[in-house]
Every structure is written in C-alpha cells, then in structure tokens.
C-alpha cells in the first residue's frame, strides 16, 4: 500500500504497575503473564476487526480502519477495549494481577504497509493518545 492519509481509530492498552510486578516475580513468571496478556490482546483486537500494529514493552497498539474502513471503527475499538479489560479480569492467572490503562482516539494518520510483513505503520497526531 502506498503512503496515504486515512481516518482511523487507535487503541492503546498499557499494563499499570509492570515495574513493581517485574520486581516481585521471577522473570519467567513475568514473561508467562505478559504472554497471556499479549495473546488476549491479539485475539480481542482481531475479533473486533482491528489490526495489531505493535507491542511496545507492556503496551499494545492497535489500529481500526486499516486496511479497510468499516464505518464503525470507533465503536469496534471501544468494544475491543472493554472486551480486553473483561478478558484480563476473568483470566484465572491474570485477574487482579494485571491492571490496564487504555486510550482510544480517532483521527487522521499517514498509513503505510510494510511490504515484507504486511503490517501497517501509522503516523500522526491520532497516535499520540
């Protein structure tokens, strides 16, 4: 996809207290918890029609409206945020251990596609939630 302007909705989810969690648990346990969190995030984002843009440490960034707009991308992103919060809260290993901060923002971005991976890269003020 050549570089083009798109109206998209961005979802960010970030684990609060991850530094303290890392200090209180064995690194392998932290990796296992984060792996479960990432798996839930990836599943929920896909189920709601979003594209996982990247994992950034303990944060997840997803884009709704790429490669194609649905007309209700903001609603899809909000539904994904609520579903992710519910998935983490009800996971027997994560519930009560991982708390999330989330932000959802809609705006215009410049979008490009990485030819090798097919992943989308977005840049613009909407990304700065």
Language model region names:
Residues 30-37, 77-80, 84, 125-129:
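Hydrophobic alpha-helical membrane-association signature
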Residues 7, 12-16, 44-76, 87-127:
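Catalytic core of nucleotidyl cyclases, primarily class III adenylyl/guanylyl cyclases
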Residues 19-42, 53-54:
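Conserved long alpha-helical elements within nucleotide-processing catalytic cores of c-di-GMP signaling
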Residues 1-7:
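Intrinsically disordered or compositionally simple regulatory linkers and C-terminal tails
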